[in-house]
């Protein structure tokens, strides 16, 4: 997947620190992995796929103390003609309107993605077909490069994860639309564990 390749090209020091899940049930596969690096507490990655759909989700949580946003990315392919791509700087402070001056501001409104409510003015949302997915690689690389420059400029070093990311994870847990889908594929117990213990464990 080209988006994932760009992530690891720009952050070559990301180290796999654990494979949290590797499931296969009801003709659906799920992989959940954790990475970290010098300035990143964790990059938590989930991939879900079956014969018709594929979902990639990753949120990068920087080390704390420098008022930095997280970086979130979603690639949700439900079938050939319905793909949703989202990436953004997701600030952990509620009602904090983050904006990067060198990147375009979002136009219009989007369900689930409200600028100022853990999403930035630059939130990038596109709906496309499977054939068009790679049309936005340059945009993704520009956003990710800007994020890398933030980290290298601020050099975060703290580990106050619950006080910094607790509200953010609680909000994302309420917002997250995949719990029902996960339950239908892997059962309620596994779905709740993934959401509470992996995806949003600080909340």
Language-model segment annotations:
Residues 1-71, 80:
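Short Lys/Arg-enriched alpha/beta "domain-start" segment
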Residues 2, 6, 132-139, 170, ...:
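Non-membrane alpha-helical secondary structure
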Residues 3-6, 10, 99, 166, ...:
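Terminal low-complexity, poorly structured segments
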Residues 7-14, 18, 24, 140-154, ...:
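Hydrophobic, Leu/Ile/Phe/Ala-enriched alpha-helical segments that form helix-helix packing faces
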Residues 57-158, 162-163, 168-170:
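Extended, non-transmembrane interaction/recognition domains
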Residues 146-149, 153-203:
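Alpha-helical oligomerization segments
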